[in-house]
Curated annotation (Swiss-Prot):
Residues of the DNA-binding region: 23-42
Name this polypeptide is given: Probable RuBisCO transcriptional regulator
TM regions (residue ranges): none
Role description: Trans-acting transcriptional regulator of RuBisCO genes (rbcL and rbcS) expression.
Family as reported in the entry's similarity comment: Belongs to the LysR transcriptional regulatory family.
Gene name per UniProt: rbcR
């Protein structure tokens, strides 16, 4: 390819003239003389062999060539700024701020441990953890508000072609009941017994609830006929409600390990029914990721994959 007919300085000048509307104002904005601005434009017009501006006393207006030039000048200069930012971030490989997203269960029971391990290795990196529904977190990653996320459940269909979804493990959902419930004496219950229970449920927008309903439907159980006593948006609140004898609930096994160990809650196994959801890491492939984010992704992938392997091969 032959030498380019323009320089970055010339593109910046053309862009500024178009934005400010005159050579004089552009010169002031760029802290150079007006003759220097005019000379650069003339040199570029001579190089391209076509005018870039219609010149009149009121305003510098772009020609068709000028419009094309400004359009690509904005993209080129933006990429140059992004390149400079990336190079600057190389100097601070182990510092910066990460915004990590997580759905309710992963944010409450998994992320604190992962963040603790990461912060021990990279103490200079600040981490902001946002815990919301899978849908809200997914949109946060897509919009650039969240750098990386770990979620359970299905990513919104409209984002599945936009985000990179790295599935790393399955999370089993358990039916929990109070220790004093008659079903707690049984080795397992029949799926039809679910209609006899009173349920404490997550709100209808929860991905956990969707997974439960879909799995039960495939097993011939219509959850629309369940007795829903109340809906809560907190796993801890649901566990406390079940412990208090207010009903039964489906929650992630990872959220009840302590309660099962202490005998506070009972995991009621359902014969011929196993409910699982996929845990995934979400990133936006269109974004530039600085080193702190790359480091975090690498570290948690190693931890999560190792943990998943040990769980599947006890």
């Amino acid at each position: 390819m032959s030498d380019l007919p323009f320089t970055l300085d010339q593109l910046k000048i053309i862009k500024t003239i178009h934005r400010e509307g005159s050579f004089k104002t552009a010169a002031k904005k760029l802290y150079i003389s007006q003759p220097a601005v005019s000379r650069q434009v003339q040199n570029l017009e001579r190089q391209l062999n076509t005018p870039i501006f219609y010149r009149d006393k009121r305003k510098a207006r772009l020609t068709e060539t000028g419009h094309i030039l400004v359009k690509y000048a904005e993209q080129i200069l933006s990429l140059c700024e992004e390149t400079c930012q990336a190079l600057d971030e190389l100097k601070s490989i182990n510092s910066g701020t990460l915004v990590i997203g997580a759905s309710q269960t992963t944010g409450t029971y998994l992320m604190p441990r992962l963040i603790g391990i990461f912060r021990h290795k990279y103490p200079q990196i600040s981490i902001e953890l946002k815990v919301h529904s899978t849908r809200r977190i997914s949109w946060g990653v897509a919009n650039g508000e969240i750098d990386l996320a770990i979620v359970g459940g299905e990513v919104p269909p409209e984002l599945q072609g936009t985000l990179e979804i790295i599935s790393y493990a399955e999370d089993e959902l358990a039916l929990i009941i109070p220790q004093a419930h008659p079903f707690a004496t049984l080795q397992s219950i029949q799926k039809e017994d679910l209609y006899r229970l009173r349920f404490i449920a997550l709100d209808t927008q929860s991905t956990i609830r969707s997974v439960i309903e879909n799995t039960l439907t495939q097993s011939g159980i219509d959850s629309r006929y369940f007795k829903i006593e109340m809906e809560l948006n907190s796993i801890e609140a649901i566990k406390n409600a079940v412990q208090s004898g207010l009903g039964a609930a489906f929650v992630s096994v990872s959220a009840i390990s302590k309660e099962l160990e202490l005998g506070i809650l009972h995991w009621a196994k359902i014969e011929d029914v196993t409910i699982k959801r996929t845990l995934s890491i979400l990133i936006n492939p269109k974004r530039y990721y600085a080193n702190p984010i790359k480091n975090f992704e690498k570290e948690i992938m190693e931890i999560l994959l190792t943990s998943a392997a040990s769980t599947n091969n006890p």
